[in-house]
């Protein structure tokens, strides 16, 4: 099975991540730096995936070399984009990046972002509505 066939699982991951961020108090309308993770044991293949991610409109970080607990060495990079927490756009990004991962036989390992705290007034306003 290729990774693209697992896209429904990634769509669920995308929604769960958005929900968790918002439930924890992150801003709903903020621009987020979304970092999609790729990995491979073959640097040359990973580099080709990075070129395709760049061509698809993502910023690409320099590849890093990591040693796993079992002693295996892997290489990884992030494909980065600024996005609102828009499920349709995140799902479209996942589709594009899963296809790139399959094309180059590298691992797509999901995405992460940074918490964007709400402004102080937003909490007070929310409390006020809860007490009405």
Curated annotation (Swiss-Prot):
The keyword Cytoplasm applies. Pfam families: RraB (PF06877). GO terms for cellular component: cytoplasm. One of its GO terms (molecular function) is enzyme binding. Gene3D superfamilies: RraB-like. Globally modulates RNA abundance by binding to RNase E (Rne) and regulating its endonucleolytic activity. Can modulate Rne action in a substrate-dependent manner by altering the composition of the degradosome. Interacts with the C-terminal region of Rne. This is Regulator of ribonuclease activity B. It comes from Alteromonas mediterranea (strain DSM 17117 / CIP 110805 / LMG 28347 / Deep ecotype).
